[in-house]
């Protein structure tokens, strides 16, 4: 089955796994998904992830979700820019999530990064998702 929005599919899998209190969730691998997971890991929203490749050439990412005293660290994770409606922001218009308690993830010419990092590097881009 083909997926029209691979990043949205990964975020939905994470949201569903957190709702069911799962410790791990797997998703097909891609470079964009891995870069977004790098940001989530650096910001402390997931424990980590491992990428494995199968004999048929397909790769899969297994994501270890993070909990603090039984409560999921990820409370809300939403896709902003979708295949049918791309959302681009300048450095001045990067939104704050939950008054700075959450993060936005952007795809910029300098790579995939969190909102505060994009402000530091003075670069805008496509607003991929918000995490709180």
From Swiss-Prot:
Keywords: Ribonucleoprotein, Ribosomal protein, RNA-binding, rRNA-binding. InterPro entries: Ribosomal_uS8, Ribosomal_uS8_CS, Ribosomal_uS8_sf. Pfam families: Ribosomal_S8. GO terms for molecular function: rRNA binding; structural constituent of ribosome. It comes from the Bacteria. GO terms for cellular component: ribonucleoprotein complex; ribosome. GO terms for biological process: translation. Part of the 30S ribosomal subunit. Contacts proteins S5 and S12. One of the primary rRNA binding proteins, it binds directly to 16S rRNA central domain where it helps coordinate assembly of the platform of the 30S subunit. Belongs to the universal ribosomal protein uS8 family. This is Small ribosomal subunit protein uS8. It comes from Brucella canis (strain ATCC 23365 / NCTC 10854 / RM-666).
């Amino acid at each position: 089955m083909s997926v029209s929005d691979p990043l949205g599919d990964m975020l939905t899998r994470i949201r569903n796994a957190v709702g069911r209190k799962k410790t791990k969730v797997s998703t097909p691998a891609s470079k964009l998904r891995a870069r977004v997971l790098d940001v989530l890991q650096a910001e402390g929203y997931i424990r980590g992830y491992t990428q494995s490749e199968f004999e048929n050439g397909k790769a899969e990412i297994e994501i270890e979700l993070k909990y603090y005293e039984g409560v999921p660290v990820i409370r809300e994770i939403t896709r902003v820019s979708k295949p049918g409606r791309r959302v681009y922001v300048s450095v001045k218009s990067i939104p704050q999530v939950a008054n700075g308690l959450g993060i936005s993830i952007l795809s910029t010419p300098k790579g995939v990064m969190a909102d505060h990092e994009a402000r530091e590097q003075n670069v805008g881009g496509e607003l991929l998702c918000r995490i709180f």
